[in-house]
Amino acid sequence: MKIFIKTAAILVLLTAALPANAYFVTYKEQYYRLFHVHHIQYPEDSIENIYWLENAIKAPFANPLYALALIENEIQWEKYRYLFTMHINIKLLEQHLFLGNKYNKRHAFFYNAPFKEQNLKSLETAETCYRAALYYWDEALNWAEKANERRLRWIDLPRVQFWQDEAFRIEKGTLNYGRTIERELGFIKDVRERFEKMENHY
């Protein structure tokens, strides 16, 4: 039995000495690759994505050789950085909208009266998520404006064409999350007022 324990201990020590195939996540592009959307998005999925995307915002850019687009000169690199940051902010606001939607109560039904406090707390959580989304929308607008500057307008980055389309749609007003978020905040206000008027029974 003692020989078995010694052998097991030696194997554990040898295994610990072997190099692992892990790598450090350091750059924006690496964090962005960890972002993913599920067919059915649960709150913990949104929170995980928010974590990766917020780290992407804080992280430095990788060398242009490892960019998600083909970068051949400094002006392309500048536009790429603006588009990337805009896109990350859009994804962050979408994740906050998904998360807020899980806590949002669309209607104040009379039979929810006994759960009035829980529903009000849920509405508060949804409002917090929507207000965070509004912050990221403002950030996305700022970065889209930079990406759409006159001197960058004709710089084409085919591998991230979707990001360029987002910036163009923001400029033209066809992509307007601000309107969506304000509408949701208005709904929350109305539903909250109805819950607050309810008695604690039906």
Roles of regions detected by a PLM:
Residues 2-10:
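Sec-dependent signal peptide recognition
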Residues 15-17:
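N-terminal signal peptide c-region/cleavage motif recognized by signal peptidases
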Residues 20-84, 193-202:
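Immediate post-signal-peptide N-terminus of mature secreted/exported proteins
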Residues 25-48, 79-112, 152-184, 188:
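Amphipathic alpha-helical repeat scaffolds of TPR domains
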Residues 59-67, 136, 143, 150:
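Residue position in alpha-helical solenoids
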Residues 109-125:
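Acidic, serine/threonine/proline-rich low-complexity intrinsically disordered regions
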